[in-house]
């Protein structure tokens, strides 16, 4: 399996029973699953309170499976600068954490209510040394940080995640509060997120901060970064990049066909009005009911260099979105208005505007309108 398939298989199975998760692990492979979970655990571990680095051995155990495989040890180095990890055991570990692979996968990728540490054990090398009671060694907080990540006890906000991962969504832009307002119901779901625009322009190594931010925020999510340039260097577990052109409907349709149903689209691409309209017109129909389509940096809709204008021209990004507001009330138009039906009239359920930022919700909107006698009166 490739990385997106592994991620989808684990996330989907973790939403079912433990038997489903065990079967998924068998399909992926025990060592491969352990490596995937080690990457996830390292990425979620918060180290801001760590003062001294320490190494911890984490053993991914499979003893509870009917056809148990050998345990898989990994080594984590937890320090003030972050977390690194590698396959293999330590010769003389200060601490050994052991946990069932299925249980840990379900804790990391399943619903919050299904988290468990019932199979976990922690062995301390110096447990019989009375000095550790008065002078705790660095391995103590290192283990605590890893377990906090495994148990979901660290829930960072988007502003902090944006700063940590180098996303521009907080700072000059102050989008994170609006994102948290609208994305909160999705945070514990197995969502598919598509962001147009990886960042860094043509530099294959630059950008990617927002993709990593979304990965950390949506702990069960799969994140796809779409860019006209090759950004494959930013691929990692649960983050995939795709080369596509947001101005080309065929390119976007191929993208949607490959990804499957989408829950959230974030357009942080070229910001050229024609491209924004094309991307919305192509991808909004592929959005799941209840999903959100987000358009960033709407200030460019007023700038001629981005095909913008100051009026309500529907060819601009803001003008196009204003037309969607009319579509919300499509059932209230008098027949004499002669308003042509739009493809989005019955599928846009709400719009939310913030400075330079808009959220469009996909939801059935097939109301019959108010009292026709009053609507048609002159």
Swiss-Prot record:
Q: Which GO terms describe its molecular function?
A: metal ion binding; methyltransferase activity
Top EC class, one word? transferase
Checking InterPro entries in the record gives:
MycE_N, SAM-dependent_MTases_sf
Its protein name is 8-demethyl-8-alpha-L-rhamnosyl tetracenomycin-C 2'-O-methyltransferase
What does the record give as the reaction this protein catalyses? 8-demethyl-8-alpha-L-rhamnosyl-tetracenomycin C + S-adenosyl-L-methionine = 8-demethyl-8-(2-O-methyl-alpha-L-rhamnosyl)-tetracenomycin C + S-adenosyl-L-homocysteine + H(+)
Keyword annotations from UniProtKB, A to Z: Antibiotic biosynthesis, Magnesium, Metal-binding, Methyltransferase, S-adenosyl-L-methionine, Transferase
Which cofactors does it use?
Answer: Mg(2+)
Q: Which organism is it from?
A: Streptomyces olivaceus
Q: What does this protein do?
A: O-methyltransferase involved in the biosynthesis of the permethylated L-rhamnose moiety of elloramycin, an antitumor polyketide. Mediates the methylation of the hydroxy groups at the 2'-position after the sugar moiety has been attached to the aglycon.
Q: Which Pfam families does the entry mention?
A: MycE_N
Binding-site residues for S-adenosyl-L-methionine, renumbered to this chain = 195-201, 210, 227, 245-246, 268
Family in the record = Belongs to the methyltransferase OleY/MycE family.
């Amino acid at each position: 399996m490739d990385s997106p398939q592994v991620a989808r298989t684990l996330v989907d199975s973790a939403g079912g029973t433990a038997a489903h998760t065990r079967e998924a692990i068998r399909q992926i492979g025990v060592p491969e699953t352990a490596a995937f979970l080690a990457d996830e655990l390292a990425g979620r571990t918060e180290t801001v309170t760590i003062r001294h680095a320490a190494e911890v051995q984490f053993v991914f155990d499979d003893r509870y499976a009917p056809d148990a495989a050998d345990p898989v040890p990994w080594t984590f180095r937890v320090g003030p600068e972050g977390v690194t990890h590698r396959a293999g055991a330590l010769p003389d570990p200060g601490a050994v954490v052991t946990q069932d692979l299925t249980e840990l996968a379900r804790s990391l990728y399943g619903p919050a209510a299904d988290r468990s540490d019932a199979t976990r054990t922690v062995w301390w090398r110096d447990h019989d040394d009375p000095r550790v009671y008065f002078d705790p060694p660095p391995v103590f907080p290192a283990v605590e940080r890893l377990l906090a990540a495994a148990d979901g006890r660290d829930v960072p906000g988007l502003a902090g995640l944006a700063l940590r991962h180098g996303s521009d969504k907080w700072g000059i832009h102050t989008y994170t509060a609006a994102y948290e307002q609208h994305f909160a119901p999705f945070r514990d779901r197995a969502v598919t997120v598509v962001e147009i625009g990886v960042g860094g322009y043509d530099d294959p190594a630059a950008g990617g901060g927002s993709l990593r931010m979304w990965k950390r925020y949506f702990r069960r999510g799969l994140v796809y970064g779409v860019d006209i340039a090759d950004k494959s260097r930013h691929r990692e577990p649960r983050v995939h990049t795709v080369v596509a052109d947001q101005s080309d409907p065929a390119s976007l349709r191929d993208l949607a066909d490959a990804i499957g149903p989408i829950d959230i689209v974030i357009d942080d691409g070229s910001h050229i009005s024609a491209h924004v309209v094309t991307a919305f017109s192509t991808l909004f129909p592929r959005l799941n009911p209840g999903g959100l389509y987000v358009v960033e940096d709407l200030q460019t809709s007023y700038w001629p260099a981005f095909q913008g204008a100051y009026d309500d021209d529907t060819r601009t990004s803001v003008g196009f979105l204003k037309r969607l507001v009319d579509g919300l009330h499509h059932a209230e138009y008098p027949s004499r208005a002669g308003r042509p039906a739009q493809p989005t009239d019955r599928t846009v359920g709400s719009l939310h505007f913030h400075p330079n930022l808009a959220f469009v919700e996909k939801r059935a909107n097939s109301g019959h309108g108010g009292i026709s006698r009053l609507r048609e009166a002159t």
